[in-house]
């Protein structure tokens, strides 16, 4: 009998990609950059993925990921790359505050609540 469930939250219960898009879109408005198109969001995701893969291979540091992804993205879109540092700081805050559940994820956790212990694991 199962008594405990350990959830790996990102990309199982929570839709990280949707949260990422929402965080970038809201910051575009907050920074007075207008609206961020779906095409631009797809480009950002590709750039972001490229930087994280470089870090995983040991080619760059985490700090280089956090700043470089937005510097490259802004340069590509004709925006001031100097915005990368404050934009990243605000992005980290917004991403942490943005919760996007996958369909039925919240209902599943709630349904299991009275039957098993549940923990988030990373």
Question: What do the predicted segments below correspond to?
Answer:
Residues 2-102:
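N-terminal helical cap/lid subdomain that shapes the substrate entry/recognition surface
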Residues 86-88, 96-100, 105-122:
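Substrate-recognition element of Asp-dependent hydrolases with the DxDx(T/V) motif
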